């Protein structure tokens, strides 16, 4: 029997796993997809929100501010890309100044540090491409940007380093208290039944399904809210220096324009409620909306330099707040984690771990190691150090992805980690091989060769993203 089973290997589930790995417990993370970071955590705005938007007194506000405060130290401990570049909420007319002032005041009572309202002259100095209609902005120096993949992988790897197990391609189909009156739960999956003393429900847009299995008397409904984005080439990455928001509305924080930690420009999202919780296809209408609304706050966005578009789903619940707590003995919800869930993840993990520790009376693990070293990036080295690295390991001299200058050595490292890459997308999210201008058109065959060699399988078994997404369907001779 496990002490804890965490359902869901997104950023919230992995944050919970990492924090719970501090304790002497047998922990398993169960994920229905083929890898970590395959749901909301892979398709979002990559923003660390300062915390001025969430309603004062809400759990969302508390954990957003705390998560943002924790992020710089966590980035150093776990070696992932993070930049506290600051954010701006742009006011486009004098009529909107009261709303901007209200946002400022909400941020102050939420405990956000350094907030101030700046006028147009200072705004233009900070952002030369700001809209001609902009009259003022809320400046939040504690806002930042992060690599959502890097953060999630770092949490997962550190959890695994401290003994947490991961089981992928395993879908939870049911759960119920153990028979005989004993404490614990049976977790039914498509690969058999597991037993545990405690469940942490971090299942993203499907967290309501698990919640309702555990507590049918108090049902929850999570709506999938889809957002479309454009990702622009590195050549557009300096169009803005900070994350630029418009004043938030009923459906969220609006269309933003932001640099990314890897030098791209990200524009989006929309906010459309959908019935299908797998509906991650972009729409023409959604992308048209991004084009139209992004230009309200930032002028001359070079959208012709877009290299891809994508859509992600947020887990929206009617109360518009995180839902975290023990709803039944040994069943802890970590549900309704929509924006600012990524920003809040470090604090969410700590809160859930504290609940579980108290419920199970866990003890600290004396040999817990809070550190993790990320994948070595030869581009970050000076020429002498890079030459020495290649001398010691020639794989770092073999460029596989030309767009992002990713080497064979980095890809091998990504595959050999725990949990490691098993698909093209797994390699892409860990190393950026395939994330550049050609969108894997050049490097995919080489990455497939390396995956097949490292995993000991034929290339015909390599997938883009697990499941039935195989790249090779047969040989030329088979089709004759």
Name each region found by the language model.
Residues 21-43:
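Glycine-rich FAD pyrophosphate-binding loop
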Residues 138-198:
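Helical element adjacent to the flavin cofactor pocket in flavoenzyme catalytic cores
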Residues 46-126, 135, 254-255:
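Dinucleotide-binding Rossmann-like beta1-alpha1 core, especially the glycine-rich loop
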Residues 55, 62-65, 90-99, 138-157, ...:
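Short beta-strand to alpha-helix junction loop
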Residues 2-29:
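N-terminal Rossmann-like FAD-binding beta1-loop-alpha1 element of flavoenzymes
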Residues 15, 175-183, 188-268, 272-283, ...:
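Flavin-dependent oxidoreductases
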Residues 252, 261-262, 273, 277-399, ...:
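C-terminal catalytic lobe of FAD-dependent flavoproteins
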Residues 278, 407-417, 441-459:
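Iron-sulfur (Fe-S) cluster-binding segments and ferredoxin-like electron-carrier domains
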């Amino acid at each position: 029997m496990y002490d804890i089973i965490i359902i869901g290997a997104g950023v919230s589930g992995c944050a919970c796993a990492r924090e719970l790995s501090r304790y002497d417990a047998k922990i398993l993370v169960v994920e229905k997809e083929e890898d970590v970071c395959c749901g909301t955590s892979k398709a979002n705005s990559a923003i660390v929100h300062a915390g001025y938007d969430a309603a004062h007194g809400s759990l969302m506000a508390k954990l957003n501010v705390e998560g943002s405060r924790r992020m710089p130290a966590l980035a150093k401990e776990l070696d992932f890309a993070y930049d506290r570049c600051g954010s701006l909420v742009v006011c486009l007319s004098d009529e909107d100044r009261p709303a901007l002032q209200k946002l400022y005041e909400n941020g102050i009572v939420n405990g956000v540090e350094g907030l101030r309202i700046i006028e147009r002259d200072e705004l233009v100095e900070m952002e030369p491409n700001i809209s001609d209609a902009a009259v003022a902005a809320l400046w939040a120096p504690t806002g930042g940007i992060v690599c959502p993949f890097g953060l999630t992988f770092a949490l997962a790897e550190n959890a695994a380093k401290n003994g947490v197990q991961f089981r992928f391609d395993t879908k939870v189909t049911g759960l119920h208290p153990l028979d005989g009156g004993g404490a614990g739960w049976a977790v039914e999956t498509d690969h058999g039944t597991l037993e545990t003393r405690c469940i942490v429900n971090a299942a993203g847009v499907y967290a309501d399904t698990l919640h309702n299995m555990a507590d049918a008397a108090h049902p929850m409904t999570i709506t999938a809210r889809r957002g479309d984005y454009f990702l622009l080439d590195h050549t557009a990455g300096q169009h803005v220096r900070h994350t630029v928001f418009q004043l938030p509305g009923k459906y969220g924080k609006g269309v933003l324009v932001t640099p990314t930690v890897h030098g791209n420009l990200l524009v989006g999202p929309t906010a459309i409620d959908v019935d299908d919780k797998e509906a991650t296809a972009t729409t023409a209408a959604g992308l048209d909306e991004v084009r139209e609304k992004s230009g309200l706050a930032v002028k001359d966005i070079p959208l012709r330099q877009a290299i891809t578009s994508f859509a992600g789903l947020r887990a929206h619940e009617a109360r518009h707040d995180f839902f975290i707590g023990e709803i039944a003995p040994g069943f802890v919800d970590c549900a309704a984690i929509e924006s600012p869930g990524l920003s809040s993840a470090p604090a969410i993990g700590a809160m859930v771990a504290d609940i579980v520790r108290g419920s199970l009376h866990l003890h600290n693990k004396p040999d817990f190691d809070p550190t993790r070293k990320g994948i070595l990036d030869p581009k970050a080295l000076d020429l002498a150090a890079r030459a020495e690295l290649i001398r010691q390991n020639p794989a770092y001299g073999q460029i596989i992805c030309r767009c992002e200058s990713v080497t064979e050595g980095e890809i091998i490292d990504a595959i050999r980690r725990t949990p490691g890459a098993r698909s093209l997308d797994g390699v892409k999210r860990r190393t950026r091989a395939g994330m550049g201008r050609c969108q894997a058109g050049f490097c995919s065959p080489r990455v497939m060769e390396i995956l097949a060699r490292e995993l000991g399988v034929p290339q015909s078994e390599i997938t883009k993203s697990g499941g039935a997404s195989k790249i090779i369907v047969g040989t030329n001779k088979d089709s004759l």
